[in-house]
Amino acid sequence: MRVNAQHKNARISAQKARLVADLIRGKDVAQALNILAFSPKKGAELIKKVLESAIANAEHNNGADIDELKVVTIFVDKGPSLKRFQARAKGRGNRIEKQTCHINVTVGN
């Protein structure tokens, strides 16, 4: 049994979120939640919410036992960029791209 959860258009770059995702891949969910709780990175908070959602989905929809669940797969894909304008000197302007990503977590036993 495998259960998915995803967060689309998360306001963090995929590269930064992948650093946190690599920490919990293949671990059991209790250990993964503990790692994320003590990680100082912004991505840890976002991934923790998605992982908790996947655990709740498994418990509610399939009646799964939380103690037996593991993080089967976790991957972070690049999302659409938000294009913004930043004023510069002498009437010029630069484009600022604010990166987003899609976080996908699959838990199972």
From Swiss-Prot:
Drop me one GO molecular function for this one.
Answer: structural constituent of ribosome
User: Could you tell me the Gene Ontology terms of the biological process aspect for this record?
Assistant: translation
Q: Name one GO cellular component term.
A: cytosolic large ribosomal subunit
Q: Pfam families recorded for this chain?
A: Ribosomal_L22 (PF00237)
Query: Residues of the signal sequence?
Result: none
Q: Which SUPFAM superfamilies match?
A: Ribosomal protein L22 (SSF54843)
Among PROSITE patterns, the record links this protein to:
RIBOSOMAL_L22
The superkingdom of the source organism is Bacteria
InterPro entries assigned:
Ribosomal_uL22 (IPR001063), Ribosomal_uL22_bac/chlpt-type (IPR005727), Ribosomal_uL22_bac/org-type (IPR047867), Ribosomal_uL22_CS (IPR018260), Ribosomal_uL22_sf (IPR036394)
Q: Has the keyword RNA-binding been applied to this entry?
A: yes
Oligomeric form and interacting partners: Part of the 50S ribosomal subunit.
Q: What this chain does, per the record?
A: This protein binds specifically to 23S rRNA; its binding is stimulated by other ribosomal proteins, e.g. L4, L17, and L20. It is important during the early stages of 50S assembly. It makes multiple contacts with different domains of the 23S rRNA in the assembled 50S subunit and ribosome. The globular domain of the protein is located near the polypeptide exit tunnel on the outside of the subunit, while an extended beta-hairpin is found that lines the wall of the exit tunnel in the center of the 70S ribosome.
- Give any extra note attached to this record: Present in outer membrane vesicle formulations which are used as vaccines in human.
PANTHER family, sorted = CHLOROPLAST 50S RIBOSOMAL PROTEIN L22-RELATED (PTHR13501), LARGE RIBOSOMAL SUBUNIT PROTEIN UL22M (PTHR13501:SF8)
Give the family from UniProt.
Belongs to the universal ribosomal protein uL22 family.
What is this protein's record name? Large ribosomal subunit protein uL22
Write down the species. Neisseria meningitidis serogroup B (strain ATCC BAA-335 / MC58)
At the highest ranks, the source species' classification is: Bacteria, Pseudomonadati, Pseudomonadota, Betaproteobacteria, Neisseriales
